[in-house]
Amino acid sequence: SPKIMDSLAVFLETSYLAQIGGPIILLVMILHFILAARKMPFSPLELREFWRQAKMMHHMDTWLWLVQVATAIVILVMASAHVINILSNLPISADKSAAGIQGGMVPFYLVLFAALDLHIAIGLYRVGVKFGILNRENRLKWRKYALYLVIGLALLSLATHYSFATMAI
């Protein structure tokens, strides 16, 4: 609701979390990308070799990693644009958020949240495999949990965007 959004905005503004937290989030996101990018195939030769080996191996985790790389690039560009847009239009308010959604930003946020959902779900899966939380016996159970997480985040996002799309400004 607009009241809840405005209450959250007032909290973020009065505690300076919007002004301080926004740049920190952006820096953490860029640092995460830089650390992860060390392993990414950037040159056409590296990408072609990766693609050839992925097709040869038929290994799901390899393809998931490629999807995670692609979503990372999408998130880096789109989330940076989102954070910069928020920081350049302070103070935050429900009216401004609704105006953005009603002004045609829905496709932008649908792509951003789809990329985020995939990236988070694949990342959690890969961390679980790396640290031995996921194994052959419980993999399907955890895949179900990841699916529930993705569906839950998608529904929360759609509900939020619907409330902004129908809000009078």
Predicted regions and their residues:
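Membrane-embedded alpha-helical bundles that constitute the cytochrome b-like, heme-associated redox core
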Residues: S1-I169
